[in-house]
């Protein structure tokens, strides 16, 4: 059933239908489209467009259709309709005849699809919030059972300073908390109702738009009809949040891939989230993490595609905007998948605490501590930094750790160095001395972990 055929003498070509028809993907919006139509039927009944009997017939048919939609029982594949809107309307007309032909009075597909899409996006924001919180809970849980593990911290992928493993976990918790904040912020801007905006200029019928908005769970109606049907900022915002969060997951995946490598060997991943090689029997590959990292680019692409699509569009609706859906559907689906597999990966992690500690002691990670020791003895930091660097060079040439150098060897560089330097150079001292808010000392880490546990329990 065409919604716009009266002005045309010829039908659409098969190729045009291939380009134009959106039912193959916007069928995802079936439940939202039907809920919007239920609200619209009530609104036009109050406006006098439908009598009581007509409204009752429509509402009963729509509610029955909604049950089928929610159960996944609608037969889209047998339909030749253009989009989800014509599919629903054609189904109603088949059941009710001319009564169903009144449903679209005062409404355009422009405000209809904008409403459907906002409803769908709002629902998925709520699901994504749950998924992000689940990853946070997994990280917090893994940190909690590994409080005493110390491993190297890196800059430039070179060992820099030792950190507690929970401190590493909580770094990603902070990133994911920002993702949650962005999702909540987005929802506040998203939650306005376009229905009643018509094609672009509003409707001539006395529709109570505030009542429609409240019925559909929106905070308010959109206040400008042109903007209401043209706006896809909420799609772009969700794609941006998805891209940012996927970037966080990708960085975490990269860390864990390295930690899991034979070169580091800090962690082992469970069999359930790894795979083998068809040729090399010994391999246990971190494929879940690699796919998480790889899917990041796919989500980035959806954001870039819609930005480019929207940048040159005049007001109001243009068919280019039909390209908003597949990218968001795919990006949010990939994000859902990656968040859920991230939980499984984190839950599977087993740490080799001895190997972590050994690596943390290597690489002269205590060189900064030596410089700080010299500062405590009254030497200016820049001078102390230079002295510590020369001590590292000497230790490298002698193939020793700094703490393995004798007092005589150390005093070559500064007379203030005494036996009390050796405790300062020990791993636990290096970590616990950073006992400041946000640091990797035991006290701030345990406080941060306790706060996270209170907010994000499994």
From Swiss-Prot:
InterPro entries: Arg_succ_lyase_C, Argininosuccinate_lyase, Fumarase/histidase_N, Fumarate_lyase_CS, Fumarate_lyase_fam, Fumarate_lyase_N, L-Aspartase-like. It holds the Pfam family Lyase_1. Its EC number is 4.3.2.1. It is an enzyme of class 4 (lyase). GO terms for molecular function: argininosuccinate lyase activity. One of its GO terms (biological process) is L-arginine biosynthetic process. Keywords: Amino-acid biosynthesis, Arginine biosynthesis, Cytoplasm, Lyase. CDD domains: Argininosuccinate_lyase (cd01359). It is found in: Cytoplasm. The keyword Metal-binding does not apply. Its main location: cytoplasm. PROSITE patterns: FUMARATE_LYASES. GO terms for cellular component: cytosol. It catalyses: 2-(N(omega)-L-arginino)succinate = fumarate + L-arginine. Pathway: Amino-acid biosynthesis; L-arginine biosynthesis; L-arginine from L-ornithine and carbamoyl phosphate: step 3/3. PANTHER family: ARGININOSUCCINATE LYASE. Belongs to the lyase 1 family. Argininosuccinate lyase subfamily. HAMAP family: Arg_succ_lyase (MF_00006). This is Argininosuccinate lyase. The gene is argH.
């Amino acid at each position: 059933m065409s919604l716009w055929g009266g002005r045309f003498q010829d039908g659409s070509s098969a190729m045009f239908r291939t380009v134009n028809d959106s039912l193959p993907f916007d069928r995802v919006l079936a439940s939202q489209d039907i809920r919007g139509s239920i609200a619209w039927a009530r609104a036009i009944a109050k406006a006098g467009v439908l009598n009581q009997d007509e409204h009752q017939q429509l509402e009963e048919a729509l509610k029955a259709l909604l049950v089928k939609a929610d159960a996944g029982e609608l037969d889209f594949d047998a339909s030749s309709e253009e989009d989800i809107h014509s599919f629903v309307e054609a189904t109603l007309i088949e059941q009710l005849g001319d009564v169903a032909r009144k449903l679209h009075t005062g409404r355009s597909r422009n405000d209809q699809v904008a409403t459907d899409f906002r409803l769908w996006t709002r629902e998925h924001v709520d699901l994504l919030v749950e998924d992000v919180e689940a990853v946070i809970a997994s990280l917090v849980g893994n940190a909690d059972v590994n409080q005493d593990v110390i491993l190297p911290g890196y800059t430039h992928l070179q060992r820099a300073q030792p950190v507690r493993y929970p401190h590493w976990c909580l770094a990603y918790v902070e990133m994911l908390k920002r993702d949650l904040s962005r999702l909540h912020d987005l929802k506040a801007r998203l939650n306005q109702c376009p229905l009643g905006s018509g094609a672009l200029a509003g409707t001539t019928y006395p529709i109570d738009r505030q009542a429609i908005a409240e019925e559909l769970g929106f905070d308010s109606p959109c206040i400008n009809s042109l903007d209401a049907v043209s706006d896809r900022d909420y799609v772009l915002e969700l794609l941006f949040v998805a891209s940012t969060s996927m970037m966080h997951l990708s960085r975490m995946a990269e860390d864990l891939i390295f930690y899991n490598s034979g070169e580091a060997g800090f962690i082992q991943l469970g069999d359930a989230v790894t795979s083998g090689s068809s040729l090399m029997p010994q391999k246990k590959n971190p494929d879940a993490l690699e796919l998480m990292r790889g899917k990041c680019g796919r989500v980035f692409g959806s954001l870039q595609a819609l930005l480019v699509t929207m940048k040159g569009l005049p007001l109001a609706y243009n068919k280019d905007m039909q390209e908003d859906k597949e990218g968001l559907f795919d990006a949010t689906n990939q994000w859902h998948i990656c968040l859920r597999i991230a939980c499984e990966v984190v839950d599977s992690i087993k740490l080799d605490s001895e190997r972590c500690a050994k690596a943390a002691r290597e690489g002269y990670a205590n060189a900064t501590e030596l410089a700080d020791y010299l500062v405590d003895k009254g030497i200016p930091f820049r001078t102390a930094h230079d002295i510590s660097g020369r001590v590292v060079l000497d230790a490298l040439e002698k193939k020793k750790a700094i703490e393995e150098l004798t007092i005589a060897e150390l005093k070559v560089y500064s007379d203030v160095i005494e036996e009390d330097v050796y405790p300062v150079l020990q791993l636990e001292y290096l970590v616990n001395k950073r006992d400041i808010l946000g640091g990797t000392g035991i006290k701030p880490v345990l406080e941060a972990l306790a706060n996270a546990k209170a907010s994000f329990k499994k």
